[in-house]
């Protein structure tokens, strides 16, 4: 079965939607693989060829604490750590994949350039997918509470993670190749 949002246009001719198999999305032609339990254990216990290099790399970008980008009228892109960005284009502001707190077994590598409480007046929240390093419930809840008029831009079925908030938030969900 293929799923897409019937209310949104599809920009790729002939695209049927995202492949939905066994109650989950499947990459289909884009490469999907289901690892066996044994392969998972082997991957987790196996040697990582980049492990030493990663441990030795102490480079971190210097974080400049500043809130002027939030209230400025200028077009701007500000990195907030990992996959989180504040973007303003022609006066419209976007926040991507907010993950502003340490997660279990996953620590932030850089501080925020501002307080999470400074992130107000945001027009759109863009969530790329539901992995924990892109979808942090605590950060999303706080951003939604601080920006009650903010709209969400979501991939298909991600609204299910929003729980009760689904009813109080405006969001279109899109398949690949939908605008």
PLM regions and their residue ranges:
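Metallo-beta-lactamase
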Residues: 1-104, 114-118, 154-179
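Active-site metal-binding motif and surrounding structural segment of the metallo-beta-lactamase
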Residues: 12, 17, 106-154, 158
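Functionally constrained cores in energy, signaling, and assembly domains
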Residues: 75, 93-96, 124, 167-169, ...
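Short glycine/proline-enriched coil/turn segments at helix->beta-strand junctions
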Residues: 90, 148-149, 167-168
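Catalytic metal-binding/acid-base residues of hydrolase active sites
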Residues: 101, 131, 177
């Amino acid at each position: 079965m293929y799923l897409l949002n019937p209310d949104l246009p599809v920009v790729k001719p002939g695209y049927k939607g995202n492949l939905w198999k066994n109650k989950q999305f499947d990459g289909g032609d884009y490469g999907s693989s289901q690892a066996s339990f044994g392969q998972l254990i082997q991957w987790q216990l196996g040697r990582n060829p980049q492990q030493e290099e990663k441990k030795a790399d102490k480079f971190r970008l210097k974080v400049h604490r500043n809130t002027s980008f939030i209230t400025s009228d200028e077009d701007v892109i500000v990195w907030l750590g990992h996959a989180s960005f504040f973007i303003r284009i022609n006066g419209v502001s976007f926040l991507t994949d907010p993950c502003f707190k340490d997660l279990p077994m996953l620590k932030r590598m850089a501080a925020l350039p501002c307080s999470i409480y400074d992130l107000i007046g945001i027009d759109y929240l863009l969530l790329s997918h539901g992995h924990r390093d892109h979808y942090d419930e605590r950060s999303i809840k706080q951003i939604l509470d601080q920006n009650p008029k903010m709209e969400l831009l979501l991939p298909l079925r991600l609204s299910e993670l929003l729980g009760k908030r689904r009813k109080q938030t405006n969001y279109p969900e899109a398949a690949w190749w939908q605008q």
